[in-house]
Amino acid sequence: MYLADEAEFVLLMSNRSRIPDEQLKAFVRVYRLPIVSLRRSVWVALMYLPALLYCSWLIRGILRRERCSRLQFNDFHFAHGAVLRALGYRGRIATWVRLDPLKFGTIGRLWLALARLSSDRLIAVSKYIRGRVAAPDVEIVFDPVPDVPVLMPSSEPNLVFMGSYQTIKGQKEAIEAFHRIAGKHPAARLIFYGSDLGLPGSQAYFAELQDQAKLGAGAERIEFRPIVKDPADALKSARAALCFSRSEPFGLVCQEASAYGIPMIATRSGGPEEIIEDGHTGYLVDVDDVAAMSNRMDQLLSDPELARRLGAAGPEIVRKRFRPSDYANSLRHIYDL
């Protein structure tokens, strides 16, 4: 954890989170709370306000007990900050904006307004997100690049796609593009690592993807595997990694793959454009442009040396652009440490 030797960090998280305690040892204490997220459900909508007030009251008690003078919200849709201000909390609040607020419509604008009112600092994770927030006082703090070994592209003709199964992520387009070039590359495989998150909409989309995978030239060579804890476990067998999102706030997969030395094929969907240098560390294609996706797949599957050259350029670029030391200095500035 960054700045662990300069401050003590207490983590407040949902009691529905499956993250085991052994992965949270960097925090001096961890509190699991009944944090409710607003969803398209009548019951959840009815319970949202009472749950928000109750959870905020619990948080206020923890902040007093822990004598916390600084509070970070990991995204703008946590409206607890506004309630805490009403309850008298006077500590410093910084709110990260990791999701695109415009995709939530009216409720997104309300959440963002509450975050602005209650926060001392509003932090965007990319230039793209700062533009979507459209406020001059929003700061940018890029996620730091992980310190990982360079793998370089695999000699195996595998394309890897990591991400939860959501229509916005673009797995459907990846399958369509792969089917187009599968006949030319009989040894190539398209491997998905993901999860349906236990959500009905994602489960339905996952079922559609499985059906789509069976109907094309690459039917026998499209695999769906569970999400992995360590990206290296997925990327070590990859010639290239894919990210075909329609809207991507930052693109952690793009950053991780580049750090490992794996070239990316990604859409011009926001964050990836700030990570990938087109033609130098990977390729950028337009959203939903399946023809361009399949063309870039074909190029990297046909030319292992090209994949190695693009992959080799990635680690140096992302390590300079997303230095952990810059991230740590930004946190010191935000929290006046």
Protein language model features and the residues they cover:
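Conserved donor-binding/catalytic core segment of Leloir-type glycosyltransferases
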Residues: L151-K169, I175-H179, L190-Y193
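Short, structured helix-loop element that forms part of the nucleotide-activated donor/catalytic region
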Residues: P20-L24, I191-A219
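Short His-centered aromatic/hydrophobic patch
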Residues: L52-C55, F73-A79, V97
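Conserved acidic donor-binding segment of nucleotide-sugar-dependent glycosyltransferases
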Residues: D278-G279, Y283-V290, Q299-P304
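Carbohydrate-associated surface elements
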Residues: Y128, P144
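A short, well-ordered alpha-helix in the C-terminal region of glycosyltransferases
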Residues: A292, Q299, L306-K320, Y327-S330
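Short hydrophobic beta-strand element within catalytic cores of glycosyltransferases
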Residues: P263-A266
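Aromatic "clamp/platform" in nucleotide-sugar-dependent glycosyltransferases that forms part
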Residues: I227, R246
